[in-house]
C-alpha cells in the first residue's frame, strides 16, 4: 500500500484549485453533497476546543472555527499542512504533524483531543474499507475519553452515482487518488463500531457523514 498516491495530488498549484473544483463543483454536481449546506455544518457541529484535523486539504473548514479554538493539523503532505496553517491563521494552530495515518501516533498525542475530523480522507487512502480500520483505531487513541471522531467520505458501493460522479470515480480510482469503489456505509459503520460505542452515519448524495464517540 502507498498512502503517498492519494497525497501526491496536492501541490501548491492544485491546492489553489481545490476549493473551486472539490468543494464547489464536485461536491454539488458530482457527489450531491454541497459543502456549505451539509459538510460545513457537520464540521462545526462536532468541533471541540482542542481539535485535530486529519487530511487538511486547503484549510477551508478551519477558516470557520471560533477564534478560541486550538487546532492541530495532521497530513502526509507538507504543502497541505502549510497551506491550511496559513489559511486558518497561524495563531490558531497548535501543532503541524507530518504523519502517515496508518502508523500509530506518537505517545504524546494519545488522549489529547476533544475532537478529530477526517473530511475526505478515507476515500483517498489505499485499500478497501476494512483495511482502513487501523486508521480509525489510531485516531481513537488520540481522543479524550469523551471525545468525538467525525468526518465525511465518498462512497463507491450502495449509492447511485450520476454520470459526472461515475466519470470522476473511474478516473480517480485508476490514478490512485481515490481507493473507494467498494466503500459502503455499512462497511464504514463496521470499522467505526470496532473502536467506538456510539456511531452515527448519514448519507447525502454519494457522501456519508459520520460521527463516533465513546471510544472502546
Model-derived segments and spans:
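Conserved class I S-adenosyl-L-methionine
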Residues: 1-47, 60
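Class I SAM-dependent methyltransferase SAM/SAH-binding core
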Residues: 50-105
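Short amphipathic alpha-helix with an adjacent loop that forms part of the alpha/beta core around
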Residues: 105-111
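A conserved beta-strand element that flanks and buttresses the S-adenosyl-L-methionine
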Residues: 117-120
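A short, conserved alpha-helix within the catalytic core of class I
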Residues: 125-138
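Short glycine-dipeptide loop
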Residues: 143-149
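C-terminal alpha-helical "lid/dimerization" subdomain adjacent to the S-adenosyl-L-methionine
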Residues: 150-201
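Core SAM-dependent methyltransferase catalytic element
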Residues: 195-216
Amino acid at each position: 500500500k502507498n498512502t503517498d498516491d492519494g497525497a501526491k495530488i496536492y501541490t501548491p498549484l492544485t491546492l489553489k484549485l481545490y476549493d473551486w473544483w472539490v468543494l464547489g463543483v464536485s461536491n454539488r454536481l458530482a457527489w450531491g453533497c454541497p459543502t456549505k449546506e451539509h459538510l460545513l455544518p457537520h464540521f462545526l457541529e462536532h468541533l471541540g476546543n482542542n481539535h485535530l484535523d486529519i487530511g487538511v486539504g486547503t484549510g477551508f473548514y478551519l477558516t470557520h472555527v471560533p477564534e478560541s479554538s486550538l487546532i492541530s493539523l495532521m497530513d502526509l503532505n507538507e504543502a497541505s499542512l502549510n497551506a491550511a496553517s496559513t489559511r486558518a491563521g497561524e495563531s490558531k494552530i497548535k501543532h503541524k504533524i507530518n504523519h502517515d495515518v496508518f502508523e500509530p501516533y506518537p505517545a504524546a498525542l494519545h488522549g489529547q483531543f476533544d475532537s478529530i475530523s477526517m473530511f475526505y480522507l478515507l476515500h483517498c487512502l489505499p485499500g478497501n474499507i476494512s483495511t482502513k480500520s487501523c486508521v480509525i483505531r489510531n485516531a481513537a487513541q488520540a481522543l479524550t475519553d469523551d471525545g468525538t471522531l467525525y468526518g465525511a467520505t465518498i462512497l463507491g458501493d450502495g449509492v447511485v452515482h450520476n454520470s459526472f460522479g461515475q466519470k470522476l470515480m473511474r478516473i480517480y480510482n485508476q490514478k490512485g487518488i481515490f481507493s473507494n469503489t467498494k466503500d459502503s456505509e455499512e462497511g464504514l459503520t463496521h470499522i467505526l463500531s470496532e473502536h467506538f460505542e456510539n456511531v452515527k452515519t448519514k448519507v447525502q448524495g454519494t457522501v456519508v457523514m459520520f460521527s463516533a464517540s465513546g471510544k472502546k
